[in-house]
Regions:
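Phosphate/nucleotide-binding beta-alpha loop and adjacent structural elements of enzyme active sites
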Residues: 1-261
């Protein structure tokens, strides 16, 4: 029996689940469970297993490009467009793009619902946003020009098939989507971060995000990360799929056959 088969057998066993549930009662194991809750890799793999292969992946809030690197392992034939507002991340994004010339591109732009000459933007490394964080991390307010997702992604999606759109913009996800109607028309999957608590001042929280995505024609499909700050569940990474699309059809087929084996 292979190592993978042994692991699968152990994990599926009742005894393993029993002892895992016992460990969850001990606070010392909380960091371990928080790590296990980060399921980006399995989440993307499940999308592939259900038959969805994007032609174009748009990574909004790319930061240094780490998400694109991780996602490309699951979608090696897709083209990637990384979009980041922080100008100082350009060397990192360029380095990632150079790993796959012609397959990975990047753009430096602050996205929002409409073009504006200047808006206030809060620089805070991974927490940079249109909405000021409620944390104690140091930040710097600056003025930047704003454009839209459709304007930046127009060339990349001109000849593309289905799109996977990822957004991690610290509370400004709905603002970006408001300026990305053409992208959404072609998207089958939207992955975004949403806050359970008031993490960014004035930013919509998870219930409002789910409701807005539903109004745009996307249903919640998976939860691939839970971010805790001590005992507080602060943020979730959510996967939405097009209502009535191929992924919902694949999921429905699995549910229909559940119990028939």
């Amino acid at each position: 029996m292979s190592f993978k088969a042994l692991v699968n057998r152990a994990v599926a066993g009742r005894r393993f689940r029993y002892y895992l549930s016992r460990l969850s009662a001990y606070p010392a194991f909380d960091p371990l469970f928080d790590i296990v809750a980060n399921r980006l890799g399995p989440g993307l793999r499940h999308i592939c297993e259900l038959g969805f292969v994007p032609d174009l992946v748009i990574d909004v809030g790319a930061h240094a490009g780490h998400w694109t690197i991780a996602a490309r392992r699951h979608f090696p034939k897709a083209r990637f467009l990384m979009i980041e507002a922080q100008l100082e991340k350009e060397p990192s994004l360029r380095k990632v793009a150079q790993t796959a010339p012609g397959r990975i591109e990047y753009a430096l732009a602050l996205l929002g619902p409409e073009p504006r000459e200047t808006v206030e933007f809060y620089l805070c490394d991974t927490g940079s946003s249109l909405y000021q964080e409620q944390t104690s991390f140091s930040r710097q307010a600056t003025k930047m020009a704003m454009t839209t997702l459709d304007a930046v992604a127009g060339k990349a999606m001109a000849e593309s098939g289905p799109i996977l759109l990822k957004l991690d913009v610290q509370g400004a996800e709905l603002d970006v989507l408001a300026g990305g109607t053409a992208v959404l028309d072609r998207a089958e999957v939207v992955i975004l971060e949403a806050s359970i608590v008031a993490y960014n001042a004035g930013a919509p929280r998870v219930a409002a995000v789910i409701a807005q995505l539903a109004s745009l024609g996307f249903n919640l499909f998976d939860v691939i990360d839970l971010r805790r700050i001590q005992p507080v569940l602060a943020q979730l990474d959510l996967v939405f799929v097009r209502a009535g699309g191929r992924l919902e059809a694949s999921a429905a087929a699995i549910i229909r056959h559940y119990g028939s084996d």
